[in-house]
From Swiss-Prot:
One of its GO terms (cellular component) is nucleus. This is Zinc finger CCCH domain-containing protein 18. Residues 388-397 have a biased composition (Gly residues). Keywords: Coiled coil, Nucleus, Phosphoprotein. Residues 1-315, 380-417, 521-1127 are annotated as: Disordered. The gene is zc3h18. Residues 53-73, 82-96, 190-202, 261-289, 530-615, 632-646, 818-833, 933-964, 1012-1029 have a biased composition (Basic and acidic residues). Residues 543-584, 1118-1146 form a coiled coil. It is found in: Nucleus. Residues 1-13, 677-740, 847-875, 882-903, 914-925, 1083-1098, 1107-1119 have a biased composition (Low complexity). Residues 622-631, 783-800, 807-817 have a biased composition (Pro residues). Residues 144-156, 167-176, 203-214, 233-245, 290-306 have a biased composition (Acidic residues). InterPro entries: Zinc_finger_CCCH-type. The modification Phosphoserine is found at S666, S1056.
Length: 1148
């Protein structure tokens, strides 16, 4: 430290400076190059002091000279006397004994001359000095006072120095150099102990050395002795100590000579008295640690001593000026207490251009001025001298840093002053930039947060922005334009609670015009009143805050709106789910109670009305999803194209088609009920089947709904199979005729037992012939069938369908599967004719029905009856098909025909969805419902519902049935031979399909792939179904529909999880039945049962019946293949539509 501390070494490299150079070094290293220019060096500081002599209170010229030489020694600008003294005393002593001599001299000076102590203290920048400075609360004046006190108390030499200034000056010059060295050491120690005193000496390290004379020379030597060990750190410590002792003696002698001591005496005495104890303790520390700095300080002090420019006045004025170099560095960091040794790496950041870094005795505003707040009393020179005394303004922790005129930014950097400094006036440019940034940020936030931002920005943003831009007009704009903004905000919410309003209110207060805002006058208007500039700033702040509040309010409003929207969406979803659940529950209840709930769902009714409006277009539209899926049916394609748009209204579909299908008095109601049940399970029984199907339908899609209506029709038809028969509603007529009306049921028994499976086949082909319907028959049909007789549940239910279907079918006239087949052909034909009559538009259904019949002709004894039902159901809609499957088991032909009529669109659209959803809905309702309605009613209900809504769907369903037959052809061919005209063969296939039923999911995929497999499955199942005559209906439905859809479930889970899922659900079987009906009616009913089934499902199955009959017997294989292809396409389309709808419908 001694070497770096030597004044000659003061211009040391940053490394040396980092080593903890004395204040002189700190000043000199930066100062020697730059401070020489800036007067940073001690010599320059002294020169500055000389210039400052008037500033400092008129330091004697000798003092100024001393300061100049001391300061100039470092920058090599020392006067001749200073050079001489520095050369012989300082240079020799400094280089050799700087550390020890300075420590000793500082101790002596502390004893001898407080001036020297004070001056030296600021000059010796010790790394510890900052801490000392922090410790010192003294302002430069205080330091001077302390020096004066110390001088008075410690030495009368100060007075003597005042007496003999001229004579003592010469001696003092020499001694002051030594004293400065000592002071540097003392200041280092004092800075450690008393940062205040050293800070008072900030002007020059020599001045800082003045602190050394805190104690009498006796005390100083004592301290020097302990300091000597510290000085001993340097090899020259002993010599320095000796020289320091000599210098102390000289200084004792010279102190009376020091004229500046008079000025310094009062301050220095006070400083010395204060610093006496501190310096004693710190002298040892500083001597040990800051010997080098002390040497520099001593040199500086000696330089100052020559002229004895170290006046308390100088110190006062010099309260550490801000380091010009640091400020040049332009980077004021708040690293504060970072060690100086980091400075090299952080020179750019911490030291700016000042290489001294933390050690610099001048204030580095953010770095080394911490703790100087109290020390520097914000002397007027500092704050006023923003640039020159800026360093002093910082009141850097190092009192050694003399108040340099260069440290202009001191005010900002003074930690205590910073508040005044922080509010530096913002240039218009800066303000504009800031405002633009704020506006941009706010606008961005608003855009993001406020839903109505586009609307609001015109009204709100302008007011806010104008305020900031035109501050002159603040009052008026705040009163006027901003008021508008506020009012707008107020409309949104209570911004007044926010501080912005208060600020604005304050601004208005100042303006004298305030809006009556709640919080306006409360917050902080008063502080702003005094200073309008400040008020403007606060106003700006308040405005910004208010704007932020407005933004927050807007954001909140946007969020609330979004939340409300989300809530509404969730509510809609919940309502859909609830409707679906209601439909399911109602279907279940209806199944259990056997009473159709026509208006269970309120929304479904509304939606039904809407759907009726849209369904008329949508039944085709509903079909279109399937239509596209089933390119074979161009009508379906057309309707499918519409459906994508109408997908949104899953409920609408079933509504309008059902009303159409339900020309009968009850069908409109049933349709509506079915629509609600489709959308929300309107029918009590049918509504329950429908409800489940509708729950799937509603959640699944409009097809789902159609399906659910169809299923609801099944439950409803179980209540009012009469409805389905006379209603001519496709699903209803089937369902009602078989279930409600004994004769339709009789027809349906034939049709159902036969058509149950044929519809299953009819639906099955679209669905997966064997796969889905059998499970449906087993699962859904058991449920559906159970209402007439539970035996119709899995496997057996097909026969119970004949038998159990007989309960529904027996309702008409209980017919054995065989009779059903015979009857089914007529009934199917009649039903198909009726369907054609009612659903002539659904030619597809007719084709579908015939195809279904033909494809299931083998197992189509039921398949025929069911085939008409299925053709109606199928042409009605795949959904109807899938729903019909379950309802088909009970109301095979009527249900399938109604289902095909109504489900033409919905079934096509929901073919997959419906088969899973509808069959699930019909199934789950059927399970409960079977007991009530034996399932035919239910199945019929769904089928009829499907048939009814399908009236619009019928064209599609007929097309689909045509397609289905093409999809079923192989199945129908295989099924037809086996159960084509034989109710039992048909029943056996359903027997098999019940197992296959289980996999309803296979509705679509299986349909494509499994229609052939379904044929084989049907063949397998047909035998098994044949084995089970009662089950055949169900199995038929399971099997033939499986060919289309039902098989999906049993053997074709791949068909579609939808089928499977309905499979899990009771309604599934109904779609299976509907599906079976369609395929079966074409295969089995094309021969004779097709007509019977058609007649049984007369309203829905007329077209299907004829189609089934024609396509079933004669062109079954060929038509079945072409229709199978069509059905496969339709199934694909339906699956796609279902997938789309599921994606769209959250509930599903």
């Amino acid at each position: 430290m001694d070497t770096p501390e030597s004044p000659t070494q003061s211009p040391q490299s940053p490394e040396e400076e980092e080593k903890g150079l004395s204040d002189n070094e700190l000043l000199e290293s930066p100062e020697s190059p730059a401070e020489a220019d800036k007067g940073v060096s001690d010599s320059e500081l002294l020169n500055d002091d000389e210039n400052e002599v008037p500033e400092h209170g008129g330091d004697s010229d000798s003092e100024d000279r001393d300061r100049q030489p001391a300061g100039r020694e470092d920058p090599e600008e020392l006067s001749d006397v200073e050079d001489y003294k520095l050369d012989r005393e300082e240079r020799e002593d400094i280089h050799q004994q700087e550390g020890a001599l300075r420590v000793q001299e500082i101790a002596q000076k502390a004893i001898k001359s407080p001036e020297e102590e004070i001056l030296e203290t600021p000059r010796s920048p010790d790394p510890v000095s900052p801490a000392a400075e922090h410790e010192r609360p003294f302002t430069p004046a205080e330091e001077e006072r302390g020096d004066d006190d110390e001088e008075e108390e410690e030495d009368e030499t100060t007075t003597k120095s005042g007496l003999g200034q001229a004579e003592l000056e010469e001696e003092e010059d020499e001694e002051e150099e030594r004293r400065r060295r000592r002071r540097a050491a003392m200041v280092v120690s004092d800075l450690k102990d008393e940062s205040s005193v050293s800070r008072d000496l900030d002007e020059h390290e020599l001045d800082y050395d003045e602190e050394v004379p805190e104690e009498p020379s006796a005390a100083a030597p004592e301290e020097d002795e302990p300091e000597k060990p510290a000085v001993g750190e340097d090899g020259e410590d002993e010599e320095e100590e000796d020289e320091e002792e000599e210098k102390r003696r000289k200084r004792k002698e010279r102190k009376p000579i020091l004229p500046p001591d008079n000025r310094d005496t009062p301050l220095r005495k006070s400083e010395d008295s204060r610093e006496g104890g501190r310096r004693d303790s710190f002298r040892d520390k500083k001597k040990e640690e800051d010997d080098g700095e002390i040497d520099e300080g001593e040199i500086d002090d000696d330089d100052l001593e020559e002229g004895e420019v170290k006046d308390p006045m100088d110190r006062k004025i010099r309260p550490r000026p801000i380091c010009r170099f640091f400020m040049k560095g332009s980077f004021v960091t708040m690293y504060g207490n970072v060690k100086f040794f980091f400075f090299k790496s952080y020179l750019v950041f911490l030291t700016g251009n000042c290489t001294w870094g933390m050690i610099c005795r001048f204030i580095h505003p953010g770095v080394n001025d911490k703790g100087n707040y109290s020390l520097i009393s914000k002397p007027d020179p500092f704050s006023p001298n923003g640039a020159p005394p800026g360093g002093a303004a910082g009141g850097g922790p190092h009192p050694l840093m003399p108040a340099n005129p260069w440290g202009a930014p001191a005010v900002e950097e003074l930690p205590p002053p910073p508040p005044p400094l922080d509010p530096p006036v913002e240039s218009a440019w800066e303000r504009g930039l800031r405002h633009a940034k704020e506006v941009l940020k706010k606008a961005t936030i608003r855009k993001e947060q406020e839903p109505d931002f586009e609307e609001k920005r015109f009204t709100v943003t302008i007011g806010e922005d104008d305020r900031d831009f035109d501050k002159e007009n603040d009052f008026f704009r705040e009163r006027g334009g901003y008021r508008i903004t506020r009012e707008i905000r107020d409309a949104g919410s209570d911004p007044y609670g926010d501080p912005y309003y208060d600020y604005e209110m304050e601004a208005f207060w100042r303006g004298g015009q305030y809006e009556n805002f709640r919080v306006q006058y409360t917050e902080t208007p008063l502080p702003y009143y005094p200073d309008r500039e400040r008020e403007r700033d606060p106003r700006e702040r308040h405005r910004e805050r208010e704007r932020e509040r407005e933004r927050d309010h807007r954001e909140r409003e946007r969020r609330q709106r979004e939340r409300e929207r989300e809530r509404e969406r969730e509510r809609e979803k919940d309502s859909r789910r609830r409707k679906d659940e209601w439909d399911r529950d109602r279907l279940k209840r209806d199944e259990k109670e056997g009473r159709p709930r026509e208006r269970p769902l309120r929304e479904p009714r509304e939606k039904k009305d809407e759907k009726e409006k849209t369904l008329k277009p949508r039944s085709p539209t509903n079909m279109p999803p399937r239509g596209p899926m089933e390119p074979p049916t161009k009508k379906d394609m057309l309707s499918v194209t519409k459906r994508p748009d109408e997908w949104n209204d899953p409920w609408c579909r079933s509504k309008s088609p059902r009303r159409r299908p339900g020309f009968m008095g009850s069908p409109p109601r049933g349709r509506r009920r079915h629509r609600p049940s489709g959308s929300s399970v309107s029918l009590s029984n049918s509504s329950r089947s429908s409800s489940r199907s509708s729950s799937f339908t509603g959640s699944g899609s409009s097809r789902s709904r159609s399906r659910s209506r169809s299923s609801s029709m099944s439950s409803y038809s179980s209540h009012s199979s009469q409805h389905s028969s006379f209603s001519g509603s496709r699903s209803r007529s089937g369902s009602f005729s078989s279930s409600p009306s004994p004769s339709p049921s009789a027809q349906r028994n034939a049709n159902k037992n036969k058509a149950e499976q044929p519809p299953a086949a009819a639906k099955g082909p679209p669905l997966k012939p064997g796969a889905l319907p059998p499970p449906r028959r087993d699962k859904g049909p058991p449920k559906v069938m159970p209402s007439p007789s539970l035996p119709e549940q899995p496997g057996k239910p097909p026969k119970p369908i004949t038998e159990t279907v007989k309960p529904p079918n027996p309702r008409p006239p209980g017919r054995p599967p065989g009779p059903r087949e015979p009857r089914e052909p007529p009934n199917m034909r009649e039903g198909r004719k009726k369907e054609r009559q009612q659903h002539n538009p659904p030619r597809r259904r007719t084709v579908s029905g015939s195809v279904s019949g033909s494809s299931y002709s083998g197992s189509s004894s039921r398949s025929r009856s069911r085939s008409s039902s299925a053709s109606a159901s199928r042409s009605g809609s795949h959904k109807s098909r899938s729903l019909s499957v379950s309802s088909v088991s009970s109301v095979s032909s009527a249900s399938s025909s109604s289902s095909s009529v109504r489900s033409a669109d919905s079934d096509d659209m929901y073919a997959d969805l419906a088969s899973p959803v509808s069959s699930a809905s019909s199934r789950s309702p059927t399970p409960g419902h079977p007991r009530k309605d034996r399932g035919p009613p239910r199945e019929r209900g769904p089928n009829k519902e499907r048939g009814k809504p399908p009236k619009k769907d019928e064209p599609f369903k007929d097309e689909r049935k045509r397609v289905d037959p093409s999809g079923l052809p192989s199945k129908a061919s295989s099924d037809m031979p086996r159960s084509g005209n034989r109710g039992h063969p048909m029943h056996p296939p359903p027997m098999g399909p019940p197992g296959g039923y289980g996999s309803h999911k296979d509705i679509k995929l299986t349909l494509l792939n499994k229609q052939q497999t379904d044929r084989s499955n049907r063949k397998r199942y047909f035998p098994s179904d044949k084995e089970r005559p009662p089950s055949p209906l169900r199995k038929r439905m399971a099997m033939s529909p499986d060919g289309g859809r039902d098989r999906r479930m049993p053997g074709r889970p791949p068909m579609s999880p939808r089928m499977e899922r309905p499979k899990g659900q009771g309604p599934r079987p109904m779609p299976s039945q509907g599906e079976r009906k369609r395929p079966l009616s074409p295969p089995a009913k094309s021969s004779g049962k097709g007509p019977a089934a058609a007649s049984a499902a007369k309203p829905p199955a007329p077209g299907a019946g004829s189609g089934s009959a024609s396509g079933s017997a004669p062109g079954k294989p060929s038509s079945t293949l072409s229709r199978r292809e069509e059905l496969l396409k339709q199934l694909k389309a339906v699956e796609d539509a279902i997938a789309r709808k599921r994606a769209k419908i959250p509930g599903k």
